[in-house]
């Protein structure tokens, strides 16, 4: 039986102008999205910059392939990790959520800092 509190979670490895990882979390019928310049934190003690970018449609969670030259985000996209997540706490500057992925598992945080788009992404101890 599916838990109604479980939402889509996916990280897409995006080899565009600069290799990065796109963290996507289902919220309000869209995928809230953050670009993470370095490998996402599998264990606690590692903090990563996560830059919030535009929302994506839910069906983008399954996208793998090539975005053609000349289009925004041109390059290759592959699914690096996927699963479900449960939101534990949320306010304007902080999200706490449990990830149930293949690579990432456990309690994670996104905390806003230095302006509107910049967040810290890390696994809680």
Regions found by a protein language model. Name each.
Residues 1-125:
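A charge-rich, low-complexity, intrinsically flexible signal that marks solvent-exposed coils, linkers
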């Amino acid at each position: 039986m599916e838990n109604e509190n479980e939402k889509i979670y996916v990280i897409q490895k995006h080899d565009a102008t600069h290799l990065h990882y796109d963290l996507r979390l289902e919220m309000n019928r869209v995928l809230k999205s953050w670009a993470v310049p370095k490998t996402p934190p599998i264990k606690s003690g590692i903090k990563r910059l996560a830059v919030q970018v535009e929302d994506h449609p839910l069906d983008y969670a399954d996208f793998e392939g090539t975005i053609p030259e000349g289009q925004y985000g041109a390059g290759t996209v592959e699914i690096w990790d996927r699963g479900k997540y449960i939101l534990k706490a949320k306010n304007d500057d902080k999200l706490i959520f449990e990830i149930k992925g293949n690579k990432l598992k456990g309690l994670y945080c996104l905390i806003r800092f230095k302006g509107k788009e910049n967040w810290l992404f890390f696994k809680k101890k």
